[in-house]
Amino acid sequence: MAVGKNKGLSKGGKKGVKKKIVDPFTRKDWYDVKAPSMFSKRQVGTTLVNRTQGTKIASEGLKGRVFEVSLADLQADTDAERSFRKFRLIAEYVQGRNVLCNFHGMDLTTDKLRWMVKKWQTLIEANIDVKTTDGYVLRVFCIGFTNKDSLSQRKTCYAQHTQVRAIRKKMCEIITRDVTNSELREVVNKLIPDSIAKDIEKACHGIYPLRDVCIRKVKVLKRPRFEISKLMELHGEGGGGKGEAGDKSERPEGYEPPVQESV
């Protein structure tokens, strides 16, 4: 008789025995996502993360997560002019069950961009890297379209190359002026009503009439060293960094406790 291995016995179990299925959500916790105080609605939503287990800490798994939220949801407004603007928020600190976020970028929805592009006009784009007073380096993208004059009988409204260059230069000048003299909080407050784009449209009217001028995208290229106190100021909670360094000891340097004679 040939001697061989019994595959059924080598596996050490009966055929057809299924492993116990454990629901992965039983090992997770819900955390509330908080937006900075620049927005009227602070409670953005909730996010899941695995509980702290061994060396894997739950708060470390949350830091760095990016949440994309519509401006209409952040401002609790049903205005259609706000719904196409998306803000990105990055988790920087976990306070209890709250995830405190900071501004991480802005973008327009694809359908809004496609709707703005039309025939018989000139599309003008500009982008520039600027630094805020509190150390954030932002790349700001601006877009605009030429508009037909009310007295013109032409079907088209194309701008000349010299006019396009002049408009692009004016866009960069206004963006640099408004961002370099402001902190990140003030820049976000300008992006919410899109006041920078309105200034550009007024300033460029003498060169060529424009329409649908807007800040298309904002990227955060570089951010300063993380400070909990500054993040708490963004969230309207002053003194958040208190107690981070601990209480100062009143004992002098080189202090040695006295030797006890009896225990």
Curated annotation (Swiss-Prot):
Q: State where the protein is found.
A: Cytoplasm
Q: Name one GO cellular component term.
A: cytosolic small ribosomal subunit
Q: Which UniProt keywords apply?
A: Cytoplasm, Ribonucleoprotein, Ribosomal protein
Checking SMART domains in the record gives:
Ribosomal_S3Ae
Q: Where is the composition biased (Basic and acidic residues)?
A: 244-254
Q: Which PROSITE patterns match?
A: RIBOSOMAL_S3AE
Q: Which InterPro entries match?
A: Ribosomal_eS1, Ribosomal_eS1_CS, Ribosomal_eS1_euk
Residue numbers spanned by region Disordered = 235-263
Give the record's GO biological process terms: translation
Q: Which residues form a coiled coil?
A: none
User: Which Gene Ontology molecular-function terms are recorded?
Assistant: structural constituent of ribosome
PANTHER family named among the record's database cross-references? 40S RIBOSOMAL PROTEIN S3A (PTHR11830)
Q: Which family does it belong to?
A: Belongs to the eukaryotic ribosomal protein eS1 family.
Whom does it interact with, and what assembly results? Component of the small ribosomal subunit. Mature ribosomes consist of a small (40S) and a large (60S) subunit. The 40S subunit contains about 33 different proteins and 1 molecule of RNA (18S). The 60S subunit contains about 49 different proteins and 3 molecules of RNA (28S, 5.8S and 5S).
Supply the name of the protein.
Answer: Small ribosomal subunit protein eS1
Q: Which organism is it from?
A: Bombyx mori (Silk moth)
Read off the lineage from the record. Answer: Eukaryota, Metazoa, Ecdysozoa, Arthropoda, Hexapoda
